[in-house]
Protein backbone atom coordinates (compact mmCIF):
# COMPACT_ATOMS: atom_id res chain seq x y z
CA UNK A 1 0.00 0.00 0.00
CA UNK A 2 1.25 3.48 -0.80
CA UNK A 3 -0.10 6.77 0.48
CA UNK A 4 1.02 10.16 -0.84
CA UNK A 5 0.27 13.78 -0.03
CA UNK A 6 1.71 16.56 -2.18
CA UNK A 7 3.73 19.43 -0.71
CA UNK A 8 6.10 22.21 -1.74
CA UNK A 9 9.76 21.26 -1.45
CA UNK A 10 12.89 23.29 -2.18
CA UNK A 11 14.89 20.34 -3.46
CA UNK A 12 12.38 18.35 -5.55
CA UNK A 13 9.08 20.09 -6.24
CA UNK A 14 7.23 16.83 -6.88
CA UNK A 15 8.24 15.12 -3.64
CA UNK A 16 5.34 13.82 -1.53
CA UNK A 17 4.94 15.35 1.94
CA UNK A 18 4.15 11.96 3.48
CA UNK A 19 5.17 8.58 2.12
CA UNK A 20 4.06 5.19 3.37
CA UNK A 21 4.85 2.09 1.35
CA UNK A 22 4.59 -1.61 2.21
CA UNK A 23 5.39 -3.98 -0.62
CA UNK A 24 4.27 -7.05 1.34
CA UNK A 25 0.68 -6.25 0.37
CA UNK A 26 1.55 -6.01 -3.35
CA UNK A 27 2.42 -8.65 -5.90
CA UNK A 28 6.07 -8.99 -6.93
CA UNK A 29 5.96 -6.78 -10.01
CA UNK A 30 3.81 -4.06 -8.46
CA UNK A 31 5.92 -3.96 -5.29
CA UNK A 32 9.14 -3.47 -7.19
CA UNK A 33 7.61 -0.86 -9.46
CA UNK A 34 6.28 1.11 -6.48
CA UNK A 35 9.65 0.89 -4.73
CA UNK A 36 11.58 2.17 -7.75
CA UNK A 37 9.00 4.92 -8.32
CA UNK A 38 9.24 6.09 -4.71
CA UNK A 39 13.04 6.25 -4.92
CA UNK A 40 12.85 8.44 -7.99
CA UNK A 41 10.15 10.70 -6.61
CA UNK A 42 11.84 11.28 -3.27
CA UNK A 43 15.49 11.44 -4.28
CA UNK A 44 16.55 11.24 -7.93
CA UNK A 45 16.31 9.11 -11.06
CA UNK A 46 17.84 5.65 -10.49
CA UNK A 47 17.76 2.06 -11.67
CA UNK A 48 16.98 -0.70 -9.17
CA UNK A 49 18.15 -4.31 -9.44
CA UNK A 50 17.20 -7.34 -7.33
CA UNK A 51 19.46 -10.40 -6.82
CA UNK A 52 16.54 -12.82 -7.28
CA UNK A 53 14.18 -11.38 -9.92
CA UNK A 54 11.38 -13.90 -9.28
CA UNK A 55 11.39 -13.65 -5.51
CA UNK A 56 8.92 -11.38 -3.72
CA UNK A 57 10.52 -8.11 -2.57
CA UNK A 58 9.59 -7.31 1.03
CA UNK A 59 10.12 -3.72 2.16
CA UNK A 60 8.60 -0.92 4.22
CA UNK A 61 9.12 2.80 3.92
CA UNK A 62 7.86 5.77 5.89
CA UNK A 63 8.97 9.37 5.54
CA UNK A 64 8.04 13.00 6.05
CA UNK A 65 9.49 16.51 5.79
CA UNK A 66 11.33 17.88 8.81
CA UNK A 67 12.11 21.55 8.31
CA UNK A 68 14.35 21.80 5.24
CA UNK A 69 15.11 18.07 5.46
CA UNK A 70 13.19 14.96 4.51
CA UNK A 71 13.59 12.00 6.88
CA UNK A 72 12.71 8.41 5.94
CA UNK A 73 12.89 5.05 7.68
CA UNK A 74 13.50 2.03 5.48
CA UNK A 75 13.42 -1.72 5.95
CA UNK A 76 14.10 -3.73 2.82
CA UNK A 77 15.35 -6.98 1.33
CA UNK A 78 18.58 -7.05 -0.65
CA UNK A 79 18.69 -4.81 -3.73
CA UNK A 80 20.99 -2.45 -5.61
CA UNK A 81 20.34 1.16 -6.59
CA UNK A 82 22.37 2.73 -9.41
CA UNK A 83 22.49 6.35 -10.53
CA UNK A 84 24.27 6.69 -13.87
CA UNK A 85 25.83 9.73 -15.62
CA UNK A 86 23.04 9.63 -18.22
CA UNK A 87 20.43 9.98 -15.48
CA UNK A 88 22.14 13.08 -14.12
CA UNK A 89 21.83 14.77 -17.51
CA UNK A 90 18.05 14.34 -17.44
CA UNK A 91 17.54 14.80 -13.68
CA UNK A 92 19.96 17.04 -11.78
CA UNK A 93 18.98 15.76 -8.31
CA UNK A 94 20.69 18.60 -6.49
CA UNK A 95 20.46 17.16 -2.97
CA UNK A 96 22.56 15.10 -0.58
CA UNK A 97 21.52 11.84 1.07
CA UNK A 98 22.68 10.76 4.51
CA UNK A 99 22.32 6.97 4.75
CA UNK A 100 22.37 5.88 8.41
CA UNK A 101 22.30 2.11 8.82
CA UNK A 102 20.53 0.78 11.91
CA UNK A 103 20.54 -2.96 11.10
CA UNK A 104 22.50 -5.04 8.60
CA UNK A 105 25.08 -3.38 6.36
CA UNK A 106 25.24 -1.67 2.97
CA UNK A 107 27.95 -0.72 0.50
CA UNK A 108 28.04 2.67 -1.22
CA UNK A 109 30.27 3.74 -4.11
CA UNK A 110 30.83 7.22 -5.49
CA UNK A 111 33.68 9.29 -6.99
CA UNK A 112 36.01 6.31 -7.12
CA UNK A 113 35.50 5.46 -3.44
CA UNK A 114 33.67 2.57 -1.81
CA UNK A 115 32.80 1.93 1.81
CA UNK A 116 30.78 -0.51 3.87
CA UNK A 117 28.38 1.15 6.30
CA UNK A 118 27.74 -0.84 9.47
CA UNK A 119 24.98 -0.34 12.08
CA UNK A 120 25.23 3.04 13.80
CA UNK A 121 27.39 4.53 11.04
CA UNK A 122 26.38 6.69 8.10
CA UNK A 123 27.63 7.76 4.68
CA UNK A 124 26.93 10.76 2.49
CA UNK A 125 25.85 10.52 -1.17
CA UNK A 126 25.63 13.36 -3.69
CA UNK A 127 22.63 13.04 -6.01
CA UNK A 128 24.38 15.26 -8.57
CA UNK A 129 27.03 12.57 -9.18
CA UNK A 130 26.81 8.87 -10.16
CA UNK A 131 26.61 6.41 -7.28
CA UNK A 132 25.85 2.80 -6.38
CA UNK A 133 23.99 1.76 -3.22
CA UNK A 134 24.17 -2.00 -2.64
CA UNK A 135 22.54 -4.01 0.14
CA UNK A 136 23.62 -7.68 -0.02
CA UNK A 137 21.08 -8.75 2.62
CA UNK A 138 18.01 -7.37 4.42
CA UNK A 139 18.75 -4.10 6.21
CA UNK A 140 17.25 -1.11 7.99
CA UNK A 141 18.29 2.50 7.68
CA UNK A 142 17.32 6.12 8.15
CA UNK A 143 17.78 8.35 5.10
CA UNK A 144 17.98 12.11 5.49
CA UNK A 145 17.76 14.21 2.33
CA UNK A 146 19.21 17.71 2.49
CA UNK A 147 19.02 20.36 -0.24
CA UNK A 148 22.49 21.14 -1.56
CA UNK A 149 22.59 24.75 -0.40
CA UNK A 150 21.59 23.81 3.15
CA UNK A 151 24.74 21.73 3.65
CA UNK A 152 27.19 23.75 1.52
CA UNK A 153 26.23 26.92 3.39
CA UNK A 154 27.86 25.31 6.43
CA UNK A 155 30.74 23.39 4.89
CA UNK A 156 32.92 24.17 1.84
CA UNK A 157 31.76 22.36 -1.27
CA UNK A 158 35.13 20.70 -1.88
CA UNK A 159 35.07 19.19 1.61
CA UNK A 160 31.56 17.87 1.09
CA UNK A 161 32.57 16.37 -2.26
CA UNK A 162 35.56 14.67 -0.68
CA UNK A 163 33.30 13.34 2.07
CA UNK A 164 30.94 11.27 -0.07
CA UNK A 165 31.05 7.46 0.09
CA UNK A 166 33.01 7.46 3.35
CA UNK A 167 31.70 5.76 6.46
CA UNK A 168 31.34 8.07 9.47
CA UNK A 169 31.44 5.77 12.45
CA UNK A 170 28.73 6.13 15.04
CA UNK A 171 30.36 4.46 18.03
CA UNK A 172 32.06 7.60 19.35
CA UNK A 173 32.32 11.35 18.85
CA UNK A 174 30.23 13.64 16.70
CA UNK A 175 29.23 10.86 14.31
CA UNK A 176 27.50 8.95 17.08
CA UNK A 177 25.71 12.05 18.35
CA UNK A 178 24.43 12.95 14.88
CA UNK A 179 23.38 9.37 14.19
CA UNK A 180 21.34 9.13 17.38
CA UNK A 181 19.71 12.48 16.65
CA UNK A 182 18.60 11.40 13.17
CA UNK A 183 17.19 8.15 14.54
CA UNK A 184 15.26 10.08 17.19
CA UNK A 185 13.85 12.44 14.55
CA UNK A 186 12.82 9.51 12.35
CA UNK A 187 11.12 7.75 15.29
CA UNK A 188 9.32 10.83 16.58
CA UNK A 189 5.54 10.42 16.66
CA UNK A 190 4.52 13.59 18.49
CA UNK A 191 3.48 16.50 16.24
CA UNK A 192 5.84 19.47 15.92
CA UNK A 193 5.15 22.93 14.56
CA UNK A 194 6.75 23.97 11.28
CA UNK A 195 8.77 26.63 13.09
CA UNK A 196 10.17 24.19 15.64
CA UNK A 197 11.01 21.68 12.90
CA UNK A 198 12.90 24.34 10.93
CA UNK A 199 14.96 25.24 14.02
CA UNK A 200 15.77 21.64 14.95
CA UNK A 201 16.59 20.74 11.34
CA UNK A 202 18.98 23.68 11.11
CA UNK A 203 20.75 22.55 14.28
CA UNK A 204 20.89 18.97 12.98
CA UNK A 205 22.64 20.10 9.79
CA UNK A 206 25.11 22.15 11.86
CA UNK A 207 25.94 18.97 13.78
CA UNK A 208 26.21 16.96 10.56
CA UNK A 209 28.71 19.47 9.15
CA UNK A 210 30.77 19.16 12.33
CA UNK A 211 30.70 15.36 12.15
CA UNK A 212 31.85 15.43 8.52
CA UNK A 213 34.72 17.76 9.41
CA UNK A 214 35.75 15.66 12.41
CA UNK A 215 35.68 12.60 10.16
CA UNK A 216 38.93 13.91 8.65
CA UNK A 217 37.37 14.50 5.29
CA UNK A 218 39.81 17.26 4.37
CA UNK A 219 42.35 16.20 1.75
CA UNK A 220 45.26 17.85 3.56
CA UNK A 221 46.19 19.82 6.65
CA UNK A 222 46.06 22.98 4.53
CA UNK A 223 42.50 22.20 3.44
CA UNK A 224 41.46 21.60 7.03
CA UNK A 225 43.08 24.88 8.09
CA UNK A 226 41.23 26.79 5.36
CA UNK A 227 37.98 25.12 6.38
CA UNK A 228 38.50 26.17 9.99
CA UNK A 229 39.28 29.75 8.92
CA UNK A 230 36.21 29.92 6.70
CA UNK A 231 34.02 28.51 9.46
CA UNK A 232 35.36 31.12 11.89
CA UNK A 233 34.45 33.95 9.51
CA UNK A 234 31.01 32.46 8.89
CA UNK A 235 30.38 32.28 12.64
CA UNK A 236 31.33 35.96 13.03
CA UNK A 237 28.85 36.84 10.29
CA UNK A 238 26.08 34.74 11.84
CA UNK A 239 26.64 36.33 15.26
CA UNK A 240 26.31 39.84 13.81
CA UNK A 241 23.53 39.46 11.26
CA UNK A 242 21.34 41.89 13.20
CA UNK A 243 23.92 44.69 12.84
CA UNK A 244 23.08 46.60 9.65
CA UNK A 245 26.15 48.82 10.17
CA UNK A 246 28.75 46.06 10.25
CA UNK A 247 31.24 46.23 7.37
CA UNK A 248 33.29 43.52 5.70
CA UNK A 249 36.37 45.05 7.33
CA UNK A 250 34.68 44.74 10.73
CA UNK A 251 33.96 41.07 10.03
CA UNK A 252 37.56 40.39 9.03
CA UNK A 253 38.90 42.15 12.13
CA UNK A 254 36.56 40.21 14.42
CA UNK A 255 37.80 36.97 12.84
CA UNK A 256 41.43 38.04 13.31
CA UNK A 257 42.21 38.13 9.58
CA UNK A 258 42.90 40.65 6.87
CA UNK A 259 40.04 41.55 4.55
CA UNK A 260 42.08 40.21 1.63
CA UNK A 261 42.39 36.81 3.34
CA UNK A 262 38.65 36.70 4.01
CA UNK A 263 37.87 37.49 0.37
CA UNK A 264 40.21 34.70 -0.78
CA UNK A 265 38.47 32.19 1.50
CA UNK A 266 35.06 32.88 -0.03
CA UNK A 267 36.39 33.19 -3.58
CA UNK A 268 37.81 29.67 -3.26
CA UNK A 269 34.23 28.48 -2.64
CA UNK A 270 32.91 30.19 -5.76
CA UNK A 271 31.22 33.08 -3.96
CA UNK A 272 32.02 36.43 -2.35
CA UNK A 273 32.00 37.60 1.25
CA UNK A 274 29.17 40.04 0.59
CA UNK A 275 27.08 37.44 -1.24
CA UNK A 276 27.47 34.99 1.65
CA UNK A 277 26.51 37.73 4.13
CA UNK A 278 23.33 38.51 2.20
CA UNK A 279 22.46 34.83 1.88
CA UNK A 280 22.96 34.33 5.63
CA UNK A 281 20.71 37.31 6.36
CA UNK A 282 18.00 36.00 4.06
CA UNK A 283 18.19 32.56 5.66
CA UNK A 284 17.93 34.13 9.12
CA UNK A 285 14.90 36.12 7.94
CA UNK A 286 13.30 32.94 6.61
CA UNK A 287 13.74 31.28 10.01
CA UNK A 288 12.25 34.30 11.80
CA UNK A 289 9.22 34.16 9.51
CA UNK A 290 8.64 30.49 10.29
CA UNK A 291 9.47 30.47 14.00
CA UNK A 292 8.22 33.84 15.32
CA UNK A 293 5.23 36.17 15.04
CA UNK A 294 7.42 39.18 14.20
CA UNK A 295 6.10 41.53 11.53
CA UNK A 296 7.86 41.59 8.16
CA UNK A 297 9.39 44.96 9.08
CA UNK A 298 10.73 43.57 12.37
CA UNK A 299 12.08 40.48 10.60
CA UNK A 300 13.87 42.74 8.14
CA UNK A 301 15.46 44.70 10.97
CA UNK A 302 16.46 41.62 12.98
CA UNK A 303 18.16 40.17 9.90
CA UNK A 304 20.20 43.34 9.36
CA UNK A 305 18.38 44.94 6.44
CA UNK A 306 18.04 48.73 6.55
CA UNK A 307 15.08 48.96 4.17
CA UNK A 308 12.09 46.61 4.30
CA UNK A 309 11.29 47.14 0.61
CA UNK A 310 14.82 46.14 -0.38
CA UNK A 311 14.55 43.13 1.93
CA UNK A 312 11.23 42.07 0.40
CA UNK A 313 12.63 42.27 -3.14
CA UNK A 314 15.68 40.18 -2.24
CA UNK A 315 13.54 37.66 -0.39
CA UNK A 316 11.15 37.26 -3.32
CA UNK A 317 14.01 36.79 -5.80
CA UNK A 318 15.60 34.13 -3.56
CA UNK A 319 12.60 32.17 -2.29
CA UNK A 320 10.04 32.83 -5.02
CA UNK A 321 7.42 34.68 -2.97
CA UNK A 322 7.09 37.70 -0.71
CA UNK A 323 7.95 37.29 3.00
CA UNK A 324 4.29 37.48 4.04
CA UNK A 325 3.12 34.97 1.45
CA UNK A 326 6.02 32.64 2.23
CA UNK A 327 4.98 32.60 5.89
CA UNK A 328 1.34 31.84 5.02
CA UNK A 329 2.22 29.06 2.56
CA UNK A 330 4.52 27.28 4.98
CA UNK A 331 2.13 27.72 7.89
CA UNK A 332 -0.44 25.75 5.84
CA UNK A 333 2.12 23.05 5.05
CA UNK A 334 3.12 22.78 8.70
CA UNK A 335 -0.49 22.41 9.79
Swiss-Prot record:
Residue stretches making up the HTH araC/xylS-type domain: 231-329
Highest taxon of the lineage: Bacteria
DNA-binding region positions on the chain: 249-270, 296-319
Example GO molecular function: DNA-binding transcription factor activity
GO BP terms: 4-nitrophenol catabolic process; regulation of DNA-templated transcription
Keywords for the protein's UniProt record, in alphabetical order: DNA-binding, Transcription, Transcription regulation
Up-regulation conditions: Constitutively expressed.
Stored SUPFAM superfamilies: Homeodomain-like
Function: Transcriptional activator of nphA1 and nphA2 involved in the degradation of 4-nitrophenol (4-NP).
Name the UniProt record assigns to this protein: Transcriptional activator NphR
Organism this protein belongs to: Rhodococcus sp
Phylogenetic placement of the source organism: Bacteria, Bacillati, Actinomycetota, Actinomycetes, Mycobacteriales
Name of the encoding gene: nphR
